[in-house]
Structures are given as structure tokens and as C-alpha cells.
């Protein structure tokens, strides 16, 4: 498995979620204040590189989303977010 640098991990944590969700075919509904609700995940709110899902008592950054919501491993998440370069 690849070793990720601190900078790559920091960059992945701060990667904007909306374009990554679109790439995966996930749809969102616009809400006030720049928030988006992820369709199919009732109550899951996304804004920039942060998300919160009060119904599930979960929240986090972009990496956390890929691991906790989509069920990927850390390495799979990193590959999805920044690629395998």
C-alpha cells in the first residue's frame, strides 16, 4: 500500500466534497448558506470539505466522508480523493 505524505493527507482532508460527490454520481440538493443535502442520505449536510449527519451523530472532513459514509478504507479514500500519484 502506498505511504501518503502529511501534505497529501492534509490536502485530501480539505478537498471540496461537492465535485467529488458529482464524480461518483451522487446528487445533492441546494440548501441555504451554501449547504448541500446529499440525496439518498436523509439529513446528511455537506459544505466545502466538511459534512455533518446529525441523524447518525457523525461529522467530519472529506477523508472521513469517504470512510464513514461510503465505507471505503483510508487508502481507497485517498486514491479516490487525490489519485494514486
Which residues does each PLM region occupy?
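N-terminal structured subdomain of primase-like DNA metabolism proteins
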Residues: 1-85
Amino acid at each position: 500500500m502506498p505511504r501518503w505524505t502529511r501534505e497529501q493527507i492534509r490536502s485530501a482532508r480539505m478537498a471540496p466534497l461537492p465535485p467529488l460527490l458529482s464524480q461518483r454520481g451522487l446528487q445533492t440538493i441546494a440548501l441555504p448558506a451554501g449547504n448541500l443535502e446529499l440525496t439518498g442520505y436523509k439529513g446528511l449536510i455537506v459544505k466545502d470539505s466538511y459534512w455533518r449527519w446529525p441523524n447518525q451523530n457523525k461529522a467530519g472532513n472529506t477523508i472521513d466522508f469517504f470512510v464513514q459514509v461510503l465505507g471505503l478504507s483510508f487508502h481507497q479514500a485517498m486514491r479516490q480523493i487525490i489519485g494514486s500519484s
